[in-house]
A protein has these predicted regions:
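N-terminal leader/pro-regions and domain N-caps
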Residues: 2-91, 331-332, 340-343
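Transmembrane helix-loop junctions and nearby membrane-interface residues
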Residues: 51-61, 113, 362-372, 376
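Non-transmembrane, juxtamembrane loop and terminal tail segments
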Residues: 1-16, 106, 377-386
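Beta-strand-rich interaction surfaces with strong enrichment in secreted/lumenal proteins
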Residues: 79-82, 92-96, 301-304
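Juxtamembrane interfacial secondary-structure elements that flank transmembrane helices
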Residues: 53-70, 113-126, 323-326
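Structured beta-strand/turn binding interfaces of compact recognition modules in eukaryotic regulators
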Residues: 54-57, 97, 107-111, 116, ...
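Membrane-proximal extracellular juxtamembrane segment immediately upstream
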Residues: 284, 288, 293-386
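Soluble non-transmembrane domains of integral membrane proteins
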Residues: 88-284
């Protein structure tokens, strides 16, 4: 009995060695317990976890507006059909139905877009994304075809992933927080920091600087002029016009081989800043390809509480066509929990695993009762004597 005690409770203490001494315990209970407690234990663990996950999911507040869909019989007011880079605007309005606590996440959702296709997610040059300008290796060059050159001009970055970037623009134009202050949608901190640190960098040789007179010179002379002194003395700039960050703050910049290369800010003018290029966080988020044809990607977040009944208005600049891949696009505003956003399948998946463990445990328990099998019965051993 002491051996059973050690197996059940650990150790070899006398306090438990002589308590369970009946023949029923020795012959039936202990082998039965050791065989079937695992099923019961896992059923309890998964069922309890499922209830907890489901309760957390119920606390998620989510609002979703589909604003363009190939299958709409009556086109949405924000639909642009096959009009690529339409650059038109429309408004999407949300009425907040429950109090929302920060962080409040802003996602866009695409359907029927297969970023998980091998030919799509391999169509990229990771060395190029890290800043290499010259000497594209044959493997990367082959993977980027047919989007490696465009009319004799090299695309940087090349490939399907970079050149199908989602370029609709969302701007929060109306809404107040619980204290009555205007809401601000933040667009920094949405990409993985490891991607920003180790996977994306401006081209080798890139540089930027404030225009003369602390950035107040915002005409073409900022780009065409050559400094006679200072850090950039004698250096030329590749920009045609300076990039205006805000009023009275303009920057000049230089991209290597600009005459023979089309960079990301030139492919997506007005969407990607030339000062950021491939380090733009919206682009970095896009380049982390999704595993399913229907996916969401983080666009921004709000770090202020919002009360029930508040009205949120987003201005959308429409550029991205979904009719070519027979999909749709949506804007989503939601809170989250430790498991992420709303997921109706996560909690039930734990229920079903717990239910399976219950069925399996019941089946083997009945089998043991009907046709018991003694543990380590030598008659079940088959071996050949030499």
């Amino acid at each position: 009995m002491g051996n059973y005690c050690a197996l059940l409770f650990g150790g070899n203490s006398c306090s438990c060695r002589y308590v369970l001494t009946s023949s029923i315990v020795d012959v039936f209970l202990l082998p039965f317990f050791r065989r079937h407690c695992a099923h019961t234990l896992w059923r309890a663990v998964f069922s309890a976890t499922g209830f907890k996950v489901q309760s957390l999911q119920r606390n998620v507040v989510e609002m979703k507006e589909k604003y363009d869909d190939y299958y709409d019989e009556i086109p949405h007011r924000c639909s642009i059909g096959n009009n690529f880079n339409a650059n038109t605007t429309c408004e999407i309005v949300f009425e907040v139905e429950e109090d929302m606590s920060p962080p409040i996440l802003i996602h866009y959702e695409l359907t029927n877009f297969h970023q998980n296709h091998r030919g799509y997610y391999q169509s990229r040059d990771d060395y190029q994304l890290l800043g290499r300008v010259h000497n594209q290796d044959p493997v990367s060059k082959n993977r980027c075809e047919p989007l490696n050159y465009l009319g004799g001009i090299q695309l940087n970055p090349c490939g399907f992933a970079a050149n199908t970037f989602f370029n609709d623009v969302f701007k929060l134009v109306e809404g107040r927080d619980a204290d009555g202050f205007n809401l601000t949608m933040l667009e920094k901190g949405i990409a993985w920091q490891s991607d920003l640190d180790y996977a994306f960098a401006q081209p080798d040789g890139f540089r930027s600087a404030l225009c003369p007179q602390n950035g107040t010179v915002c005409d073409k002379s900022c780009c065409t002029g050559v400094d006679t002194e200072g850090e950039y003395a004698g250096l030329e700039w590749s920009c045609d016009e300076p990039y205006k960050v805000k009023e009275d703050e303009c920057y000049r910049y230089f991209y290597p081989n600009d005459n023979t290369t089309q960079y990301l800010h030139e492919t997506y003018k007005g969407i990607i800043s030339p000062l950021e290029g491939v380090t733009n966080e919206h682009f970095v988020v896009w380049m982390r390809t999704a595993t399913q044809p229907t996916f969401r990607k983080l666009y921004g977040w709000i770090d202020q509480p919002i009360r029930k009944g508040e009205r949120l208005v987003f201005e959308v600049t429409l550029n991205y066509v979904v009719s070519r891949f027979r999909g749709s696009k949506s804007l989503i505003v939601s809170t989250n929990n430790i498991f992420g956003g709303e997921n109706p399948y996560l909690g039930p998946s734990f229920y079903w695993i717990g239910f399976y463990c219950l069925l399996a445990g019941t089946f083997f328990a009945v089998k043991q009762l009907v046709r018991p099998r003694k543990l380590a019965d030598p008659k079940h051993l088959h071996f050949k004597l030499d």
